[in-house]
């Protein structure tokens, strides 16, 4: 939501049960721990990694500048841009979109697009049971991960 405030566009694909290797290969390997600072640095305008999607596997950003299939769903609003169409097009994963034009956050899940969502809705969807993202045989705790990202945004007491 910090990126939305400054209208920095983003396309964040959260890998679920289906491994997204074919899309990962279209981008640049990152293999960095998922933090708000990493996301801000990747999607900063006029930087080499800002175009395309990132793929999140477990608690890591595995690749950036990835190409995704665009949805050809004619029911989608004509005012939606490429990021939103790509988010709906990759139905194998949950995808978070930050609009560069409006700063609004949307979420695509299983071909459905939830537009202009608030932080609570996003947290709820990320913590629901259908996100069975497994890393090293363990269920990823999305609530804990969201708390860690939030803590990374807070200034330290040092």
What are these regions (language model features)?
Residues 1-158:
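Divalent-cation
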């Amino acid at each position: 939501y910090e990126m939305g405030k400054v209208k920095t566009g983003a396309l964040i694909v959260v890998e679920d049960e289906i491994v997204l290797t074919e899309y990962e290969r279209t981008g640049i390997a990152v293999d960095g721990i998922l933090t708000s600072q990493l996301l801000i640095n990747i999607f900063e305008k006029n930087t080499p990694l800002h175009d395309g999607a990132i793929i999140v596997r477990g608690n890591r950003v595995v690749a950036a500048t990835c190409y995704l299939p665009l949805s050809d769903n004619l029911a989608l609003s004509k005012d939606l841009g490429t990021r939103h169409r790509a988010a709906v097009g990759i139905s194998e994963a949950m995808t978070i979109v930050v609009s560069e034009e409006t700063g609004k956050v949307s979420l695509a899940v299983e071909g459905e697009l939830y537009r202009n969502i608030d932080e609570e809705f996003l947290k709820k969807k990320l913590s629901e049971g259908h996100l069975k993202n497994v890393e090293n045989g363990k269920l990823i705790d999305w609530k804990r991960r969201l708390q860690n990202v939030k803590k990374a945004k807070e200034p330290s007491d040092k």
